[in-house]
Structure formats: C-alpha cells, structure tokens
Amino acid sequence: MNMLLLVPEDFIGPDRVRISGRRHRQLHDVIRAEPGKRCRAGILNGPVGGAVVTAISPEETELTVECMLPPPPKQPIALVVALPRPKTFLKVLHAAVTMGVGRICFLECWKVDKSYWSSPVLTPEPLRETLRLALEQCCDPVMPEVIFRRRFKPFVEDELRSYAGTSRILLAHPGVDAPPPAGPVGETTLLIGPEG
C-alpha cells in the first residue's frame, strides 16, 4: 500500500477518519505505524495529500487527513481486451490500473470461453477490491471506467469508434512483424486479442 485510499464512510469528522480491516492491518502490522506517523492519502475519486496517525489500536486507526491536491492525470490510453481466463483477468485489470489506464473494456470474442463470464471474479466485490488495491499501489484515487461487452461484432461496428473518440486505434496482433507506428504518442485505444 503506497497510498491510503479513503472512502466517505471512513470520515468521522471534516478532516478525521477511522479505518479498520485490511488498511488498518497494513498500518498496524506491516508499517507498524505509531501516532505522528505520516502517510500518503487520497480520497476515492477525489484529491490526494497526506494523513497523520492520531491514534492506533489493535482494531482500528484514526488519522487526520489533508487532501487538497488534484489526482495525477490518467495515461491517454484506453484498452479493449478479449476477456482472459479468470485467474488472468484480475492480473490484467490490476496491471492496467497501476499503469494509469483510465478506461478498460473487456470483450467477448470467438476464442473466449463462455464460462469465463460466469466467474465469481467478475462480480462487484472482487472487482472493487482489485481496483482499490491497484489504486493504492499507483497512488491514484480515481477509479477507472471498466465495462464489459458480451457481443463482439456489435461493439466493433457500433461502439468502438465512440469508445475510442479521436484517439488512434491500434490492434496488437502476434502475427505482424511490423513495428508500431512511429511518431508522437497521443491518445491511443489499444485492442488486445484473446489468449492462445
């Protein structure tokens, strides 16, 4: 945890928070924080700054928070990824978020096993936890946009252009020996096909 990610439910006053659970255990057991210890903090989908531990017990930690700086900008990259195996899905999601990708679309295609869509890793709680862990790692409090599309052809024909906006669209293809386009890197939508 490189940044303490705070949610509105943590606040017990205008600039005071109380945390428990995983985030508290990280401060208490791993960092061994004591009153006066400073750490980076960010408010979910809001500003970043710092926090100072004011009280810590085996069950919870209280901190004073000062978050007034704007969050770091996202990379000008959007991803469209064929839905990978469930074990790989959370790794792909985590890696993309830690690299600053702000928009990710997971897509159905012919080689995607239909059973992947019923995996418990695609339910809200594992998604939320993976996203929060990735945001804590990269010190960015802004939740990326993650969408799922079950139909390949309608997405490519009807939504891809609006999803990509004015960005250039690149398709990562394993059979092409040509290097990627040269020149300045601007907004890019990168399409990544299925495993195998």
Residue ranges and their predicted role:
Residues 174, 182-196:
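A glycine-rich beta-strand to alpha-helix segment
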Residues 48, 58-60, 72-76, 99, ...:
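Short connector loops at helix/strand junctions that flank enzyme active sites
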Residues 70-170:
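RNA substrate-binding interface of SAM-dependent RNA methyltransferases
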Residues 162, 180-183:
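A short acidic-Thr-Gly-centered motif at the start of a beta-strand
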Residues 1-69:
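N-terminal positively charged helical leader segments and presequences
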Residues 12-13, 150-157, 177-179:
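A short acidic, often aromatic-flanked loop/helix-cap motif at beta-alpha or helix-coil junctions
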Residues 43, 108-109, 173-176, 194:
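Short secondary-structure boundary segments
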Residues 3-4, 16, 38, 61-62, ...:
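Structural motif
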